[in-house]
Amino acid sequence: MPADLMEKNSSSPVAATPASMSNTPDKPKTASEHRKSSKPIMEKRRRARINESLGQLKTLILDALKKDSSRHSKLEKADILEMTVKHLRNLQRVQMTAALSTDPSVLGKYRAGFSECMNEVTRFLSTCEGVNTDVRTRLLGHLANCMNQINAMNYPTQPQIPAAAAPHPAYGQPLVQLQGAAPQSSPAPIACKMGGPPVEAAKVYGGFQLVPAPDGQFAFLITNPAFPHNGSVIPVYTNSNVGTALPPSVSPSVMPSVTADSVWRPW
């Protein structure tokens, strides 16, 4: 075999070695390198989510405030957030007012919670040494002023329902005395009246219904939530000379003698 041919055959494997090494796969990226490469993509997605949420929030807040969206088409992000905060504060104030009107104990719970938080702040400021004395004094004074304002708040006024006395065994309804309905020289005895509704329409007088009685007198009707709406009516006669009315089903001869125990009197 010629010598030059042997050199060509011997050199061919060595020449093919660099080509085979160039086809080897790259090393896997580390976690830090992967985060660096995906950070721009994640930032782009985050901004897209923020912009989409702000767009929906803008539509909702403009609808809630009854404002024309065409006039507020170029609202800044800060304006949208400020309008949302103000709207939520107004809603919270309305809900607090409604809760106080329906459940007066809410105000007591609020006072107790505020007092507890104030005590915790006072305890922290008294034990912390890094707080400036002026700042501590102003903060405690502000909290004390707020506490005084909360304590000065009154419960919402609700219509007072006259208290009912103990029911007499012979009657199905308790005897009620009306206080402050109309000036009169003597206390007005109250009788339970069993029967249908009054013939003429009732008139509202001082929060009570003024209904003419069949005997020509006038009666103030007191609604009692403890009894059904279509049940018996408890009239309070303005004339103290009107006697105690008996139910139609009970005759005076069968009825036992009614003494002063059946009618409440202050004497």
UniProtKB/Swiss-Prot annotation:
One Pfam family hit: HLH
GO-annotated molecular function: bHLH transcription factor binding; DNA binding; protein heterodimerization activity
Stretches assigned to the Orange domain: 110-143
Listed GO CC annotations: nucleus
Polar residues composition bias: residue spans: 8-25
Keywords: Developmental protein, DNA-binding, Notch signaling pathway, Nucleus, Repressor, Transcription, Transcription regulation
One GO term (biological process): negative regulation of muscle organ development
Subunit structure: Transcription repression requires formation of a complex with a corepressor protein of the Groucho/TLE family. Interacts with the bHLH protein hes2, and binds DNA in the form of a heterodimer with the bHLH protein hey1/hrt1. Interacts with the bHLH protein hes6; this interaction may inhibit the transcriptional repressor activity.
Domain notes: Has a particular type of basic domain (presence of a helix-interrupting proline) that binds to the N-box (CACNAG), rather than the canonical E-box (CANNTG).
Protein name: Transcription factor HES-1
Originating organism: Xenopus tropicalis (Western clawed frog)
